[in-house]
């Protein structure tokens, strides 16, 4: 015979203030836990969606990032003429020789400057990225000092809106379009003509070469040929994998810092739940004795108090997840430690994060309620009935 759930529920409802405060304490911990997971997922999604599995990025061997990479002009010519590279409808190869440069720009809401990544792209650069769309203005003309800005750059930095001008590399550059890259890393970049940018920054070499495969299954052959060619000191990776690796350092930092904070805060929430449950046991000693006298076993009492603790944890989980869900409406920016430029991304809540956060809340409830539940189950019947 088990203790009815209605009994447990009425006990929580009878102590509204204590129940609410305990649940809110757990909710704050769940909020921190879920927000960290959402932040990590947002960063991962932003970086992974920057790359396409059909594209290959070729950089200098062991460079790690495009910023550190150098690809000679003759090497780039060899790479883009590999047989696995696809052709466009105009008969030209779908390859883009690109250069990466960092500049400092002032933000719109303050005069503080931050690094922004400038990407020089070839004529096929935007065709290789189907997720990129020009939402305002137009594409820049090849051979000109026109540029297009990612929507996050246009919103956050002075001079990055359509019709405005930016001055860098001793030239005036006119912003002629805004691109929406589907919440990928390209939203935090400025694009221009690769040849003009290389001349302006006096760079004789490219940073990378982007290729589209005519068949994704031919990647191993392309990779082997490029990396074994003695004329080249380059390595080839699928673009999606390359950008996913770029997010690892920052994602790991966010994860470990968030987990440490969650553990510290959860200790406080568990202690709070434990105090609440101990007080509940002390105040209901007579009730517990009556239940035992009516035939309920120690295991039934233990289960009833654990269910009560689980209900507290569930309430905290629901409140915390509800609070965390509103973070999806915010976009934050941080330094990408791989490229040393600012990267903007959003919080993303998915089913996996919901389940992990709710499970975390239930675990806090069980841990906080276990010892008080054991105490309740071990109370002597006669002593309990004498309690007033």
Spans of features found by a protein language model:
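Short cytosolic juxtamembrane segments of multi-pass membrane proteins
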Residues: 374-388
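Short, membrane-interfacial amphipathic segments enriched in basic
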Residues: 1-6
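Hydrophobic, regular-secondary-structure patches
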Residues: 27, 31-117, 136-138, 143, ...
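Mechanotransmission and gating elements of multispan inner-membrane complexes involved in transport
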Residues: 86-89, 95, 106-113, 139, ...
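Short juxtamembrane loops and helix-capping segments at transmembrane helix boundaries
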Residues: 328-355
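Hydrophobic alpha-helical transmembrane segments of multi-pass inner-membrane transport and secretion
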Residues: 16-43, 251-287, 310-319, 363-367
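Transmembrane alpha-helical interface segments in multi-pass membrane proteins
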Residues: 278, 283-332, 356-368, 372
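Short beta-strand boundary microenvironments
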Residues: 114-156
């Amino acid at each position: 015979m088990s203790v009815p759930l209605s009994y447990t529920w009425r006990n929580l409802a009878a102590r509204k203030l204590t129940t609410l405060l305990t649940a809110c304490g757990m909710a704050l911990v769940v909020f921190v836990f879920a927000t960290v997971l959402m932040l990590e997922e947002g960063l991962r999604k932003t970086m992974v969606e920057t790359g396409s599995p059909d594209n290959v990025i070729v950089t200098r061997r062991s460079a790690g990032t495009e910023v550190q990479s150098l690809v000679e002009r003759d090497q780039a010519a060899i790479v883009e003429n590999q047989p696995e590279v696809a052709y466009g409808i105009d008969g030209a190869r779908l390859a883009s020789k690109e250069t990466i440069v960092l500049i400092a720009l002032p933000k719109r809401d303050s005069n503080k400057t931050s690094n922004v990544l400038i990407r020089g792209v070839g004529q096929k650069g935007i065709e290789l990225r189907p997720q990129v769309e020009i939402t305002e203005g137009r594409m820049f003309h090849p051979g000109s000092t026109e540029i297009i800005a990612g929507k996050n750059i246009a919103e956050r930095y002075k001079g990055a809106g359509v019709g405005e001008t930016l001055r860098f590399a001793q030239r005036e550059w006119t912003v002629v379009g805004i691109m929406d890259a589907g919440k990928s890393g390209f939203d935090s970049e400025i694009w221009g003509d690769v040849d003009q940018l290389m001349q302006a920054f006096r760079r004789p070499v490219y940073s990378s070469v982007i290729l589209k495969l005519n068949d994704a299954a031919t990647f191993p052959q392309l990779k082997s040929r490029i990396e074994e060619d003695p004329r080249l000191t380059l390595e080839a990776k699928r673009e999606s994998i390359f950008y996913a690796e770029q997010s690892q350092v920052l994602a790991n930092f966010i994860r470990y810092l968030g987990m440490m904070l969650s553990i510290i805060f959860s200790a406080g929430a568990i202690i709070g739940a434990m105090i609440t449950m101990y007080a509940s046991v002390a105040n209901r000693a007579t009730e517990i004795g009556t239940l035992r006298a009516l035939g309920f076993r120690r295991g039934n009492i233990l289960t009833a108090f654990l269910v009560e603790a689980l209900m507290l944890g569930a309430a905290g989980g629901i409140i915390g997840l509800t609070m965390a869900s509103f973070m999806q409406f915010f976009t934050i920016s941080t330094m990408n430690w791989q490229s040393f430029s600012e990267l903007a991304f959003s919080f993303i809540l998915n089913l996996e994060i919901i389940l992990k956060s709710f499970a975390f809340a239930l675990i806090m409830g069980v841990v906080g309620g276990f010892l008080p539940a054991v105490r309740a189950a071990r109370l002597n019947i006669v002593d309990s009935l004498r309690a007033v």
